[in-house]
């Protein structure tokens, strides 16, 4: 009898947890209250999160970690290494799991994406074929061999941002995009992250 009651309690708890989690996710899809972009414009929805060479949503390459923490975008990291470390988006910032932010000497240097829910502002995403990336970026793309994946590539978009010292890099397995990132040169080109 106690076993049945325990099972029933667990099932009811799981259903309630799922309902709360679903409601929270729906809230994340709505406006992020009180948040503004670097130019002062309000950020309306999570759909505004498209990666480009300058950043992802309100997280901008070159902003300080303190600015991002104070805006509620990134988690505070009192233990952060001064040279280089990764920081995760703050819960409630509307940034999906799978986005990691590299901070070098206290400033956002690069943003890594390994989730299919984030695209570039040109619509490129994880799972896209190399040919699709080449068709989107054309002559702006530089192709180089992947350091660790046989047959894989780094597809680097320099474009106009190269003069500003920024780029975007797509990693592939030779067929499709497995992850991508944007940020300052040289950090965006570091294969091992901070390693």
Predicted region positions:
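Second-shell loop/turn segments in exported
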Residues: 52-59, 115-124
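Short, low-complexity, Pro/Ser/Thr/Gly-rich segments in the mature regions of secreted, periplasmic
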Residues: 182-195
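A cross-family detector of function-defining hotspots
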Residues: 32-33, 64-104, 130-176, 182
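Post-signal-peptide N-terminal segment of Sec-exported extracytoplasmic proteins
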Residues: 44, 49-76
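C-terminal motif of bacterial Sec signal peptides marking the signal peptidase cleavage site
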Residues: 20-23
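Bacterial N-terminal signal peptides that target proteins for export
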Residues: 2-11
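Short, low-complexity, disordered segments immediately C-terminal to signal peptides
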Residues: 25-46
């Amino acid at each position: 009898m106690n076993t049945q009651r325990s099972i029933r309690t667990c099932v009811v708890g799981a259903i309630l947890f799922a309902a709360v989690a679903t409601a929270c996710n729906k809230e994340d899809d709505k406006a992020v209250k009180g948040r503004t972009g670097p130019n002062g414009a309000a950020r309306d929805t999570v759909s505004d999160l498209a990666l480009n060479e300058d950043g992802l949503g309100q997280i901008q390459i070159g902003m300080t970690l303190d600015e991002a923490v104070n805006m509620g975008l990134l988690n505070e990291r009192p233990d952060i290494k001064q040279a280089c470390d990764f920081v995760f988006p703050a819960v409630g910032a509307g940034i999906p799991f799978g986005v990691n932010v590299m901070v070098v000497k206290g400033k956002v240097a690069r943003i890594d994406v390994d989730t299919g829910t984030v695209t570039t502002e040109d619509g490129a995403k994880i799972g896209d074929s190399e040919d699709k990336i080449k068709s989107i970026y054309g002559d702006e793309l530089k192709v180089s061999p992947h350091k660790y994946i046989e047959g894989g590539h780094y597809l680097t978009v320099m474009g106009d941002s190269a003069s500003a010292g920024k780029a975007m890099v797509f990693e592939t397995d030779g067929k499709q995009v497995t992850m991508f990132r944007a940020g300052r040169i040289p950090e965006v080109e570091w294969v091992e992250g901070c390693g």
